[in-house]
Amino acid sequence: MAKDLKFLRNIGIMAHIDAGKTTTTERILYYTGLTHKIGEVHEGGAVMDWMEQEQERGITITAAATTTFWKYPTVQGQVTKDTQQYSINIIDTPGHVDFTVEVERSLRVLDGAVALFCAVSGVEPQSETVWRQADKYRVPRICFVNKMDRAGADFFNAVSEIKSKLGANPIPLQIPIGSEDTFKGVVDLIRNQAIIWNDEDLGMTYQVVPIPEDLKETVEEYRQKLMESVAEYDEVLLEKYFNDPNTITTEEIMVAIRKAVIDMSISPVLCGASFKNKGVQALLDAVCTYLPSPLDLPPVQGTNPDTEEKQIRKPDVNEPFAALAFKIATDPFVGRLAFMRVYSGKLDGSSYVYNNRTGKKERISRLMQMHANKQNPIDSIEAGDICAAVGFKDIRTGDTLTDEKNKIILESIVFPEPVIGYSIEPKKQADVDKLSMAISKLVEEDPTLHVETNEETGQTVMKGMGELHLEIIIDRLRREFKLEINQGAPQVAYKEALTSTIEHKEVYKKQTGGRGKFADIVFELGPREDGQMGLQFTNEIVGGAIPREFIPAIQKGFAAAMANGPLASYPVESMKVKLIHGSFHEVDSDSLSFELAARIGFKEAAKKASPVIMEPIMAVEVTTPDEFTGPVTGDLNKRRGIMRGMDAKGNTQVVKADVPLSELFGYVTDLRTITSGRAAATLTFSRYEQVPKQLADSIVEKVKGTANK
């Protein structure tokens, strides 16, 4: 019998690093009975942080998926006749900016999210990045202000920052009773009652007590705001609100909040202290009450690859099967694991699925429900499920899996380009092939990891999203694949750009006895005016000067040539080519001749199109005590930083600047020295900008010098 999707939640837990995501997830697993003891991040025992590097560093690197169950509603933890069992698929995502890809691919397949904020720090830079990603995928969310027990905790400041920094509409559903070491409970604004958690049973039960006198005014103010906010989303409530607000029932308020959350008009805010076991059960109740089930969201849309017609798939087991592979991982015991979100239909274990990217059928050998890195075998999966499958020979992140007779391609996942690289080689020559195999496995798992061979130096260059990202990859090569690696100094992922448009004629001729080679093209080449990436190719040839069958080869030649720019062989990411004239030879012309003419023509023409070197610019935010503001800003200025302003937060300043990545290697260590370890920095990729002429010349000289060695 198909499960009732009304009681299914696919959620993610997202936040800035150190906001308490993994600790909150561990408490959820404890309270839902999936673990019998609480794992602590600082002890390296968190269930969801299962990679060795995660347990050592106390940060989450990969998005671990877990299925758990929660009974709701209950009274003091006891079931009633109205209690239902909810199935909750939780994806715990990393907060470090280098692992944004894990957040991106998780949000693509979620129905709702819990956004965690630290009561002390409020909205931090990575919170803003993740919030924007959730907006992009239209993921409804509820907010949880964590760490209310910490010195400097300020619930109302956090709510204010959610509004001002994220442009959200936060509506508190609770008001904290006390803060810092006096935090002991909350006032539930919907039921208008105070709740104090019992420490004896780790917060499993609570006492309902009178609302403290000193909070009554604040409670009245925020309850009024809550009523006003939800009344706007329901005409019946609005009428009741104006006539007699006291007639509005708890159930009506909750239904209105749910409606407003699902259409992303509001973000309810709860609070607690996960580490002290306070507030997590109410958060689980809120997940069940306010976040959508697969049935509450519009059917997923896609395209039929054969007809290119738009199609939809409803979350129903009777619809044709459709799933999206959102993560590939390698398990030492079962091999390649493909994590999937099933949008429609049903799939039994040991059956075949059709991969719309490869155009091939593959047999799944096993289906599994995941609990961090442990697998529980299951017989089948159906609409709404998040699970893992074993048996794929060729699978990539973003692949759509269907049955062969009902094809559909769902919107894939777009990942950012890497900005930093290291040259790598094995310490032992005998390990060259082993390294190649290991790297191809890691690249399969991580779409933001790129590996390429520098044609001129012969070096293998591994590129990623930041120093920590690549450090962890090299660590994995050592631990998982037993490889010893030599790595070069960090390399910036420079790019090249054309800044003027020129016309060029290229004639490619080769005569070696017998049939020769001939192609003649005249084209305009320059920067795109629309600011988009890639090649914008237009064919303006009339009268058959070049036969139509050769045009795709010309386009292919230009697209391939963009990989090596004219100055220092860095890629040209964006350009336009207008093919305006040319000629061909009846016998000697073929597709390859025209492709080569385009490649050679690009090389010659690009030199004359005012090429420049582009460098990645990072948005840097440094949180520092007031007394170090001067040294911090001075240091950023020395690094060619452009200041974007400062925000005061108590006795600290948040210094914001845009700084070229090339000036930031080892910055975190230097910052520690400047501020005696009292400042923290986040570096987020912002954009590419032109390198100043003098520096560009030295970059080109350096590349040419390396190539000539």
From Swiss-Prot:
It is found in: Cytoplasm. InterPro entries: EFG_II, EFG_III, EFG_III/V, EFG_IV, EFG_V, EFG_V-like, EFTu-like_2, G_TR_CS. It comes from the Bacteria. GO terms for cellular component: cytoplasm. Pfam families: EFG_C, EFG_III, EFG_IV, GTP_EFTU, GTP_EFTU_D2. GTP binds at residues 15-22, 92-96, 146-149. Keywords: Cytoplasm, Elongation factor, GTP-binding, Nucleotide-binding, Protein biosynthesis. Its main location: cytoplasm. GO terms for molecular function: GTP binding; GTPase activity; translation elongation factor activity. Residues 6-295 form the tr-type G domain. CDD domains: EF-G (cd01886), EFG_III (cd16262), EFG_mtEFG1_IV (cd01434), EFG_mtEFG_C (cd03713), EFG_mtEFG_II (cd04088). GO terms for biological process: ribosome disassembly. Belongs to the TRAFAC class translation factor GTPase superfamily. Classic translation factor GTPase family. EF-G/EF-2 subfamily. Catalyzes the GTP-dependent ribosomal translocation step during translation elongation. During this step, the ribosome changes from the pre-translocational (PRE) to the post-translocational (POST) state as the newly formed A-site-bound peptidyl-tRNA and P-site-bound deacylated tRNA move to the P and E sites, respectively. Catalyzes the coordinated movement of the two tRNA molecules, the mRNA and conformational changes in the ribosome. This is Elongation factor G. It comes from Amoebophilus asiaticus (strain 5a2).
